[in-house]
Amino acid sequence: MKRFGPYLIFAAAMLWATDAPFRVHLTKDLSSNFIVLVEHFFDVLIVLPILLMNLKVFKALSLKQWGAVLFIAIGGSALASVAFTQAFHYVNPSVAILLQKLQPLIAIGLAATFLKENFNSKFWLWTILALFGAYLISFAGFKAQLFPGETLNPNLMGVGLALIAAFFWGGSTVMGRYMLSSVNFKVMTSLRFTLAFVFLLFMNLYQKSIPQLSTVTKTDWLFLLIVAITSGVVSLFIYYKGLETTKASVATLAELGFPMAAVIVNWVFIPNSALVWPQIVGMGVLLFAIFSLSRYNQQQAIKASKISLNSN
């Protein structure tokens, strides 16, 4: 299973991008905070049986472990999304997206500090390749392109918010790997959704962003349910199953499946949106890097097992 862990994370990250066509419809009439709240409500309904069957596990968690769970649920699920969205009010989308590409490097740094993960020269080679591939996918012209009507606006507040989002997302990968040494992937998923839902509920009530439910159409409810299942609970089950056997430093690079899938989804669903050759090359480079990182992850696991056996 250690060999397939990075592939599961890559597949989960690609699922995160499938909600784009539905969100385009939903954001026309509903606030982003309310959309995320309802998604988490549906997700909590699905994971509630798991939550109830594992109450003893929750009682056994240490203060440090609860801190990690809260970081993931509040930081990774809520605050990161809010910070990244707010960054667009201060800087151009292209600047925010470019800064978000620092997320893997932040996660690698946290993995080295918090989890004491070690890296060899091969890891850094595949890391550079993966980041280069992701960069080509997002910026096919080899440089960060401004969107129509944009002018360069490197506002310090916007830069800070984008980096905060990258920190929370990168940190959530590391904290998730830490927690999975104590709980299984199903318990981790249920914890994340439940605590995030409670936080989002209070945030929506405070900001008064919950609309009259009568104004939410049947199509809205259907799309919210689809998003909650596909890019929500299903993708996180797959993600945490993969993270159980994957180093956090490898996992954060496997998450680059998200920008690749986002470009493909745009190509399929947005009229006159075409894939250009740098993006196709970037996809090939990224896939090769993920394949190589998967082998690296397996080799590191075998090495760790041998060291453990010898020490015993």
Walk through the language-model features, giving the residues of each:
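Loop-to-transmembrane-helix transition segments
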Residues: 4-12, 51, 59-83, 156-165, ...
